[in-house]
Amino acid sequence: MYPVDLHMHTVASTHAYSTLHDYIAEAKRKGIKLFAITDHGPDMADAPHHWHFINMRIWPRLVDGVGILRGIEANIKNIDGEIDCTGPMLNSLDVIIAGFHEPVFAPHDKETNTQAMIAAMASGNVHIISHPGNPKYPVDITAIAQAAAKYQVALEINNSSFLHSRKGSEDNCRAVAAAVRDAGGWVALGSDSHTAFTLGEFAECRKILDEVDFPEERVLNVSPGRLLRFLESRGMAPIPEFAEL
C-alpha cells in the first residue's frame, strides 16, 4: 500500500460518484496520508466550472490527519500543448495533471500526439501526464520519457487503465515504465478513482513496475514527503500543515 494517491474524481465531475468527505473517510480507513482531488478540466462536457478550481482555496489542508492536495486533470487541447487550466486556476492549485481526452483532443497520429504531449510538458505548467499508455493515442514513448525527465514531469501509471477503461494499455504502460527508468525520470501512480472505494488501489500498477524492475526511489507515491519535495522543486510553496505527514 502506498500512502499517496494522485488521481481521483468527485461528484463535481458528474460521471464520478463520491464526495470529498467520502474520500477522506476512505483515506482514514485505508491509511492513505495524502491525496489529490483532480476533477476534469472545464473543457470536458461534464466537468466543473473554472470557479470550482479557484475556490478550492477554502478547503482545509488537513482533516483528521489526512492531507488534501488541490488539483486538476486538465485537458491537452492542441499540438501547442495548451491546457484548459490557466491564470487564476493555475495559481490556486497544487497539482496539475494533464492528458488526452477524446471530447477535447481527438486521437491523431503518433507524431502529432507526441508533439502535443511534449509541448504540454515543456510549458512548465504540468506536473504529471495522465495515462500516457492509452493505446488510442500512440506516442513515441522513448521521446516522451526523455522529455519528462528533462522537464521534471512525472508520467502516470494509471491503475484504472487495466480494469475499467483504456483496455489494451498493458504493453504501452510497461514500455512507459521501462523508458522512464532508463531516462531517470519519475512515475506517479494514480488510482483514477471515480468512486472512493478504489482510492489507493495500485495492484495492477505494482505488477507493471515489478515486471520492469522499476526503482522504488523514482516513484512519487512512496511517501508524502517525497511527493511534496517534488512539487516544491517545481515551484509549489511549502505547505506548513503537511510538515508532519
Swiss-Prot record:
InterPro entries: Phosphatase_YcdX_put (IPR023710), PHP_dom (IPR004013), PHP_phosphatase (IPR050243), Pol/His_phosphatase_N (IPR003141), Pol/histidinol_Pase-like (IPR016195). Gene3D superfamilies: Metal-dependent hydrolases (3.20.20.140). GO terms for cellular component: cytosol. The keyword RNA-binding does not apply. The keyword Hydrolase applies. Keywords: Hydrolase, Metal-binding, Zinc. It is an enzyme of class 3 (hydrolase). GO terms for biological process: bacterial-type flagellum-dependent swarming motility. Zn(2+) 3 binds at E73, H101, H131. GO terms for molecular function: phosphatase activity; zinc ion binding. Its cofactor is Zn(2+). Zn(2+) 2 binds at H15, H40, H194. Zn(2+) 1 binds at H7, H9, E73, D192. Its EC number is 3.1.3.-. Binds 3 Zn(2+) ions per subunit. It holds the Pfam family PHP. Belongs to the PHP family. Homotrimer. This is Probable phosphatase CKO_02035. The lineage of its organism: Bacteria, Pseudomonadati, Pseudomonadota, Gammaproteobacteria, Enterobacterales.
